[in-house]
Amino acid sequence: MNTSQLREKFKEVFGVEADHTFFSPGRINLIGEHTDYNGGNVLPVAITLGTYGAARKRDDKVLRFFSANFEEKGIIEVPLENLRFEKEHNWTNYPKGVLHFLQEAGHTIDSGMDIYIYGNIPNGSGLSSSSSLELLIGVIVEKLYDIKLERLDLVKIGKQTENDFIGVNSGIMDQFAIGMGADQCAIYLDTNTLKYDLVPLDLKDNVVVIMNTNKRRELADSKYNERRAECETAVSELQEKLDIQTLGELDFLTFDAYSYLIKDENRIKRARHVVLENQRTLQARKALETGDLEGFGRLMNASHVSLEYDYEVTGLELDTLAHTAWEQEGVLGARMTGAGFGGCAIALVNKDKVEDFKKAVGQRYEEVVGYAPSFYIAEVTGGSRVLD
């Protein structure tokens, strides 16, 4: 969607002209899954599937939200003085949370807004539509109210919204990738220290194909919080002998030597995934820096195997996509991405083989699962921004 279309749609809905238009990307994580809330390393990219917005300041204290993705909900009106979580306010709880925490941080938002939203991230796909929306709202408020914010502070407010307003115990990776994204670069982020590097992403004759299971996954209702609790318990058991706060601080030799302290087989598996995935992510960064895409692909495969057998967050749909992808010509690697339990997988595929790949994987998936997957090519882009 371009800026003139955005402005046109805004005027159709609200009857006035928008002040500005905005874009906030989605994200995929190339490798480093379920490590971000364990103090580990991640390697995400911001992508051109994302959330568009048009907005205008109002003279009163009323917030009016409209989403083209939830047209049936119409315009949702919220008084600026009432920024509490309310289930019936549906998707607007995300903007409300961001506004609430911006105010709590001392920023003056002294009037209402009209905000039009259009997203082309498939709902429930695990490509971070909620984080994309959170950062979009942050950028809108920055622009309309002339607030000067460090981008990292906005990223943290997005995470705070997810954790303390919506109630999902997620890490910081999604908001970080979306807020800090850069053209044709992956972000190597240490989630423990928030130190990061931009890693140039030269895929040569290959593209990242996103494979959507089309199985809806509600993060708050999934086993996400359960996995996090298992990891936290494993850390507390290891603390009997080790001075650590997170699993991300461990190398595999140390973990192996002290894993006997963990009193449950499942918790050992969960912790082992995190420790090894952390090492794979470091190796993947090196592979990208040296142009070793075959090595990078093998690490993607190993990541999926670990998520399937040790972390147990894949399921029939994601496994069918990844396993079938591995068998196709021109594929360097494939793995689930995001929280799992549905959502998406990604594959690194030779450009000339993409159509054959989609046909073969799509056919097999439909045979096994009973309905078709969707495919998208991921273009890497910069972070949340003002368009005009």
Swiss-Prot record:
Catalytic activity: alpha-D-galactose + ATP = alpha-D-galactose 1-phosphate + ADP + H(+)
Residues that, per the record, bind ATP: 67, 124-130
Main subcellular localisation: cytoplasm
Any single Gene Ontology cellular-component annotation: cytosol
Places the protein is found: Cytoplasm
First-level EC class: transferase
InterPro entries associated with the record: Galactokinase, Galactokinase_bac, Galactokinase_CS, GalKase_N, GHMP_kinase_C_dom, GHMP_kinase_C_sf, GHMP_kinase_N_dom, GHMP_knse_ATP-bd_CS
Residues engaged in binding Mg(2+): 130, 162
Alphabetized Gene3D superfamilies for the sequence: 3.30.230.10, GHMP kinase, C-terminal domain (3.30.70.890)
Residues that hold substrate according to the record: 33-36, 224
Keyword Metal-binding in annotation: yes
NCBIfam families reported in the protein's UniProt record: gal_kin, PRK05322.1
Family of the protein in this entry: Belongs to the GHMP kinase family. GalK subfamily.
Functional summary from the UniProt entry: Catalyzes the transfer of the gamma-phosphate of ATP to D-galactose to form alpha-D-galactose-1-phosphate (Gal-1-P).
Official protein name in the record: Galactokinase
Gene that specifies this protein: galK
